[in-house]
Swiss-Prot record:
Keyword RNA-binding attached: no
Annotated InterPro entries: Helveticin_J
Pfam families reported for this sequence: Helveticin_J
Physiological role: This heat-sensitive bacteriocin inhibits the growth of closely related Lactobacillus species.
GO biological process: defense response to bacterium; killing of cells of another organism
Coiled-coil ranges per UniProt: none
Lineage: Bacteria, Bacillati, Bacillota, Bacilli, Lactobacillales
Alphabetically ordered keywords of this record: Antibiotic, Antimicrobial, Bacteriocin
Protein name in the entry: Bacteriocin helveticin-J
């Protein structure tokens, strides 16, 4: 991976065990004002769990499978503003749907972003058409590309609910970033009712850029794993990164980090102004006898986040199992 300006001056402000009761990675954690949410893949279904901080996060409230499924690391609150009919938006969340086998990827990625309303859409769903949704994510922004080359697709919302990020990866290499006004996105979805899609190619955006060396295993790539995206109120973009540990009788733990793309340095030519939080050298997330896998990032403010981390260890049969999912509140400078 490419060397960036690094910091290890990290502070753990709080932490807690999600205690989901199920041995699987929490791919996305979200700490809300009332509840804590977790996204796990359970028997092929994207499952959203909910609970209170300090207790078990183990109540399944949403299960997406079939055409409503697909690998996703997106679970983002849609904001606190009223909809186009003057109704409260509380209860609406963004999540990835519609599985798609992509050339060059072993993962069945979600290719659309749906908006789910927990007030009336909890429980199991089998079709992406159960929800209003954003489609043609590969056509977002100023640099569209072929849909069969889209190997990641995620969404994020800024803490003040003004900015909406679509982040995709083309051909397991090129990172595409498009920032929208969140009100614009929500209003377009409101206009579509309960089950139609919005073609992102037709939606006005605020900024769009690509990083052609974002992802890969070579020394010129920024990250070798993308576990989560988020952005702060100023438009700084953050990426959490760590591959799952290799397991072949022994473990090999991969480098863990958070990469920050400043709002004033959104180009490959400005990568010398990017920052990396070196969590491996920091060491504060390491637990004896367990091997970490950094998962999602939830930005609270600039250089301040909740970070979800899964931990793996061997059981008595020598099998690799996920044995713990922690959420850490971190800050750094």
């Amino acid at each position: 991976m490419k060397h960036l300006n690094e910091t290890t001056n990290v502070r753990i402000l709080s932490q807690f065990d999600m205690d989901t009761g199920y041995q699987a990675v929490v791919q996305k954690g979200n700490v809300g004002s009332k509840y804590v949410y977790g996204l796990q893949l359970r028997k092929g279904a994207t499952t959203i769990l909910r609970g209170y901080r300090g207790s078990k996060i183990n109540n399944p409230i949403l299960e997406l499978s079939g055409q409503a499924g697909g690998h996703t690391q997106t679970w983002e609150f849609a904001g606190d503003r009223k909809d186009i009919n003057g109704e409260e938006r509380a209860g609406q969340w963004f999540i990835g749907v519609k599985p798609s086998k992509i050339e060059g990827s072993k993962i069945i990625w979600a290719k659309q972003i749906a908006r789910v309303d927990l007030r009336n859409q909890m429980g199991p769903h089998y079709s992406n058409t159960d929800f209003p949704r954003l489609s043609y994510l590969n056509r977002a922004g100023s640099n569209p590309f072929a849909g069969n080359k889209m190997t990641h697709a995620e969404a994020a919302v800024s803490p003040d609910y003004t900015k909406f990020l679509i982040a995709t990866v083309e051909n397991n290499c090129i990172g595409h970033f498009t920032i929208y006004n969140l009100d614009t996105i929500n209003e377009k979805l409101d206009e579509k009712g309960n089950s139609e899609d919005v073609n992102l190619e037709t939606v006005k955006y605020e900024d769009s850029f690509i990083i052609d060396n974002l992802y890969g295993d070579d020394n010129n790539s920024i990250v070798n794993s993308i576990q989560g995206y988020d952005l702060d109120n100023d438009g700084n973009i953050y990426i959490s990164s760590q591959k799952a540990p290799d397991f072949d009788g022994s473990y090999y733990a991969h480098h863990k980090q958070i990469v920050k793309i400043p709002y004033y340095a959104r180009s490959k030519e400005s990568e010398d102004q990017w920052r990396a939080v070196n969590l491996s050298e920091f060491g504060g997330l390491d637990i004896p006898g367990k091997h970490s896998e950094v998962e999602s990032i939830q930005i609270i403010g600039e250089n301040h986040c909740y970070l979800t981390v899964a931990y793996h260890s061997k059981n008595k049969a020598g099998e690799n199992k996920t044995t713990l999912n922690e959420i850490y509140e971190l800050s750094w400078n």
